[in-house]
C-alpha cells in the first residue's frame, strides 16, 4: 500500500546546502517525491505545524528557528513512507541518538538543528500535508 508523508528540510539543511544530498538519500530509499517547494515559513504556518508543542519551554525557539530561513517542503510517497523516512532520518538528537548512515547521524550537528522533519503517523501526515500543500 502506498503511503504519503510530509518531509521538511529545515533552515539549517537549506543553509548548509544539503538539499541535494537529502533528496538523493530519499530517492535511494525508494521513496517518490510527489511534490516539492521551497517556502518561507510565516508565523501562522509555524504555529499551526508545531501546535502540539505550544506551551512547552522550547516552543518560542522552535518557531524562531523554523521561520529563520527557507524550508524545503516535500510530499513523499511509497510503501510505508512514514516509517521509511523516519528510519532514514535517524534519531532526533544527531550527536547522541542518530545512527551513522542516517541523515541526522551523518549530517546533523545538534538537536534543534537536526536538518529534517518527517510526519510521525498517518493522521499527522494528512494534517501536515494539508497545512503545507493545501488541497493536495
UniProtKB/Swiss-Prot annotation:
Entry cofactors: Mg(2+)
GO annotations of cellular component type: cytoplasm
Pfam family, one: NDK
Coiled coil: none
Recorded GO MF terms: ATP binding; metal ion binding; nucleoside diphosphate kinase activity
EC number: 2.7.4.6
InterPro entries, A to Z: NDK-like_dom, NDK-like_dom_sf, Nucleoside_diP_kinase, Nucleoside_diP_kinase_AS
Domain of life per record: Bacteria
Subcellular location: Cytoplasm
Primary subcellular site in the record, as a coarse category: cytoplasm
NCBIfam families: PRK00668.1
HAMAP family, alphabetized: NDP_kinase (MF_00451)
Known partners and oligomeric status: Homotetramer.
Protein task: Major role in the synthesis of nucleoside triphosphates other than ATP. The ATP gamma phosphate is transferred to the NDP beta phosphate via a ping-pong mechanism, using a phosphorylated active-site intermediate.
The protein, known as: Nucleoside diphosphate kinase
Source organism (scientific name): Mycolicibacterium vanbaalenii (strain DSM 7251 / JCM 13017 / BCRC 16820 / KCTC 9966 / NRRL B-24157 / PYR-1) (Mycobacterium vanbaalenii)
Gene: ndk
